[in-house]
Amino acid sequence: MEQAPEDQGPQREPHNEWTLELLEELKSEAVRHYPRPWLHDLGQHIYNTYGDTWEGVEAIIRTLQQLLFAHFRIGCQHSRIGITRQRRVRNGPSRS
């Protein structure tokens, strides 16, 4: 019969501590790109939905990651990640 593996001791860094550090990094990045009142309302919505739980922390992390990814991908003005907008230059007359 299979048995669950034994506890191999403490993790290198506690998961909760790592999660809170990630949340702080995302929050500090988000305030550089989004209005504070908007982020506050988002936080209130998450808090009203999940309360003061780890599920709420995970939800706000997931939401901020998605928002920042989309923001950078669409083309943040001070990011090198976004889509570059290039003008098309015609080489010669059109063959329509």
UniProtKB/Swiss-Prot annotation:
The modification Phosphoserine is found at S79, S94, S96. Residues 1-42 are annotated as: Homooligomerization. Homooligomer, may form homodimer. Interacts with p6-gag region of the Pr55 Gag precursor protein through a (Leu-X-X)4 motif near the C-terminus of the P6gag protein. Interacts with host UNG. May interact with host RAD23A/HHR23A. Interacts with host VPRBP/DCAF1, leading to hijack the CUL4A-RBX1-DDB1-DCAF1/VPRBP complex, mediating ubiquitination of host proteins such as TERT and ZGPAT and arrest of the cell cycle in G2 phase. Its main location: virion. Phosphorylated on several residues by host. These phosphorylations regulate VPR activity for the nuclear import of the HIV-1 pre-integration complex. One of its GO terms (cellular component) is host extracellular space. The lineage of its organism: Viruses, Riboviria, Pararnavirae, Artverviricota, Revtraviricetes. It is found in: Virion; Host nucleus; Host extracellular space. This is Protein Vpr. During virus replication, may deplete host UNG protein, and incude G2-M cell cycle arrest. Acts by targeting specific host proteins for degradation by the 26S proteasome, through association with the cellular CUL4A-DDB1 E3 ligase complex by direct interaction with host VPRPB/DCAF-1. Cell cycle arrest reportedly occurs within hours of infection and is not blocked by antiviral agents, suggesting that it is initiated by the VPR carried into the virion. Additionally, VPR induces apoptosis in a cell cycle dependent manner suggesting that these two effects are mechanistically linked. Keywords: Activator, AIDS, Apoptosis, Cell cycle, Host G2/M cell cycle arrest by virus, Host nucleus, Host-virus interaction, Ion channel, Ion transport, Modulation of host cell cycle by virus, Phosphoprotein, Transcription, Transcription regulation, Transport, Viral penetration into host nucleus, Virion, Virus entry into host cell. Belongs to the HIV-1 VPR protein family. HAMAP family: HIV_VPR. GO terms for biological process: DNA-templated transcription; monoatomic ion transmembrane transport; protein homooligomerization; regulation of DNA-templated transcription; symbiont entry into host cell; symbiont-mediated activation of host apoptosis; symbiont-mediated arrest of host cell cycle during G2/M transition; viral penetration into host nucleus. InterPro entries: RetroV_VpR/X. HIV-1 lineages are divided in three main groups, M (for Major), O (for Outlier), and N (for New, or Non-M, Non-O). The vast majority of strains found worldwide belong to the group M. Group O seems to be endemic to and largely confined to Cameroon and neighboring countries in West Central Africa, where these viruses represent a small minority of HIV-1 strains. The group N is represented by a limited number of isolates from Cameroonian persons. The group M is further subdivided in 9 clades or subtypes (A to D, F to H, J and K).
